[in-house]
Amino acid sequence: MENISDKIQKIRSEYGDKALVPEDLNSDPIQQFESWLADAIEVEASEPNAMAISTVDSENNPRSRYVLFKNIVNDSLVFHTHYESSKAKEINNNPNVSGIFFWPEIYRQIRFEGIASIADSKVSDEYFKSRPRGGQLSAWASHQSEEIEGREILEERIKELEKEFEGKEIPRPEFWGGYLID
């Protein structure tokens, strides 16, 4: 039986016809990003708005995870999270972040670095209102980066919240919102 190392070494892709042509690139990085993101969306890439974002913990260890990019505000990338999550705590301690979008379907990736800061509440409120009701309830129910005893605990919390907010607009929780990456 072939081991995983042998299998990995045999993986090959040809990129000759996918080369970047400098004349086709936009000198504005945000416009270039928007162009490639549009290309990824057009070919129905899997999760084209998923970005890996890296922070640094209190011991200066890098930590990466995927988040969903949701908007561009004044040339800043926007994502949303629980303000008590490990990523939020790390950003509050050291706002320098880096990340990458990878779209294998179009043979493109974009790497970025920047300073993360909490978005204006208007940005967070607008996005929260656009979320499906289930996503709004999940924001209230989930305490990111905290271990739970089982999925049934989370599901029970969502049922409680469904009753609490039945027939009402769900407000954005104060502990949840957006970050801008400049």
Model-identified regions with their sequence ranges:
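Binding-site signature for planar aromatic cofactors or substrates
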Residues: M1-D182
